[in-house]
Amino acid sequence: WASEPQIYGRFGYGLATRSCSVHVPRDPQALHPTVPTDPQVRLRLADPTDWKAFAGVYEDVATRRPGLPSRDERWWGRAVRDIAELRGGSSALRCVLAEDASGVRGYALYQTKQHFDENFGSGEVSVRELMAGDSPVLAEIYRYLFDLDLMGRTVLPRLPVDDPLLHWLQNPRRANPVLGDGLYVRLVDLDKALVSRTYAAELDVVLEVTDRHCPWNQGTWRLAVGAGDQAPRSCERTDRAAELALDVTDLGAAFLGGTSLSELELAGRVREDRPGAAAEASAAFAHFPAPWCPAIF
């Protein structure tokens, strides 16, 4: 996360993940009737400091979403930290688990803050973290959070940009979605970085890269990759004519698959010297689900 993005941009960091923040008014019927359910799922409250009970859910999501860092005990301690003096009138941190006979399949860490308007409860649910292994489990947790007693709205900061919630809400406008920036990525050894990730489609493209701070990245590179985990990948210097010209900042932005090189070309940040090269590279670099990093560090 960048304290001031323009500073990081000067040193080659590109905006690689985004998130969406929403404020959902309380409504037991907030979700459309067609939203998936799972009758086998049960919800129960748990001690948030017993994070080992739900850590597996986080790690499962992290293996599928680029940008989510793995956590050791110190990181988990930070994730569930609850300092009474810093609550600002909110409740202690709470945890709800979604589980079935196979075990825990989702969880949410949240706090509530009481407030009354003319004797009517209008408090706020503030969600610190929400992870689910699949859509039905995610929907069950949302239903719970959107109908807590005495609450007026639920605040969900930094959701993935492809989270299904806005498609599930019967009135998404009332959620006031706001798009925000997230993780900034800097490629230090671009050849090693580009062969370390998988690609969604075959690609053979020549990149002309500018890098003011890491001169070993500067120059023309041929990136040739196959699709999938086991496909061959190579990134080597070449004297072939460039097909895409870009700064290392923009390569960092595209690296996790959340920023399209075609978008950057449209914005004038990438120069396309061979027609179609940006679209081909965008298809190869793309990743679903979208990259995401809700943790601020």
Regions picked out by a protein language model, each given a short descriptive name:
Residues 33-297:
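Intrinsically disordered, low-complexity, positively biased terminal segments
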Residues 1-30, 52:
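Active-site-proximal cofactor/substrate-binding loop regions of enzyme domains
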